[in-house]
Amino acid sequence: MYVILSSKPGQFRTELVEGLVAVEAYDYLFYGRRTAHFVIAELAHPVKVKVVEEFGEDVDATSRPAPTVNYVPSKFLEQFDTLQGARDELTRLATFGSMDITLVKRDVHARDWRATD
């Protein structure tokens, strides 16, 4: 089974946990600006996906509260039987009329998916 994990820089990020293996990674560009990052991951068994709250650059680092961490059961994520099924869904998510939306494939092993453009 495959799932799509999403992260929105400055808002939240999902992190891999044991039982999830990253297969492909994509940046979502909206009119040339990266607004999200997606990872297609293979799900070996039911897990709880780690979701970490992030803070934007507008929040002063010294007054920033500790991030909230949640664990979301994988049963709540849409699951795909094949890698191609997950790719097709990601493509569908990145298509909306004539808007300038692009998926850019990234190195799945890159550590800092939050880097600015």
Regions found by a protein language model. Name each.
Residues 1-74, 92-95, 99-111:
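Short aromatic-glycine-(Arg/Gly/Cys) micro-motifs in beta-strand/loop hairpins
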Residues 113-117:
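Short acidic DE-rich linear segments
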Residues 84-90:
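Short amphipathic alpha-helices within nucleic acid-binding modules
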Residues 78-79:
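A structural signal for short, well-ordered beta-strand elements
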